[in-house]
Amino acid sequence: RVTSKQEVTEYCKKIYSKGYSKGVTTGIKPLDPHYTFRKGELTIITGFANIGKTTTQLFLMMMASKLYDYKWLMYCPENEPIGDLMIDIAEMYCGKTADKDFSDRISQDNYLRAVEWAYEHFTILTFEVTPTVDEVLESFEEYMQVVEIDGISIDPLNDLKAPQKVSKYDYYYDALSNVRRFIKRHNVMFYLVVHPGTAANRRRNEDGTRPAPNM
């Protein structure tokens, strides 16, 4: 299919009249010049183990829910039981811990209200066996037929089952292509957490520090 001149002209007129679609504030002023919330975009979070990839993602998702009432659909097999994940979100929402070892922890009433809020804004899908990326996306779409969703998260992509006899490059290329098409169809925010490969974990700079990982 070739895009017609009329389609292009109408698009250009719309941009001239209404401007480009811009992101909205994260509620974190120092971050906004570099990153904002915008539907229809893919955000990939990567980094070495235990540096806070999931925590960073959850906090941003929580802020989007708190500011704009976003509803999220997640696949996060490394963060079970689900109750612990809801506690993390509730603590972020309140800005206080629920840990009984802290004297200034959140009150029980506020804690339970925050957990209820988290459950209303975050839905977690689980599978009995490790799914493929296509199976996860299909399950997301089935759920989205009955519930309006603003954002999606897969954490991590590496956990998903890869086809046999397919190179890692081809697998990730196809997976990201399918994710992009999903985003275009549904106009959602999409967070994708990716662990760096073994080779990236082994690399060191001349001073012995690890270089920043990439895809």
Task: Enumerate the predicted regions with their spans.
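Phosphate-binding/switch region of NTP-binding enzymes
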Residues: 32-34, 174-215
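Phosphate-binding/switch loop-helix module in NTP-utilizing enzymes
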Residues: 123-185
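The Walker A/P-loop phosphate-binding site
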Residues: 2-96
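Switch/connector loops and helix/strand junctions flanking conserved nucleotide-binding motifs
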Residues: 81-86, 95, 161-164, 199-205
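Generic enzyme active-site microenvironment
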Residues: 76, 153, 193
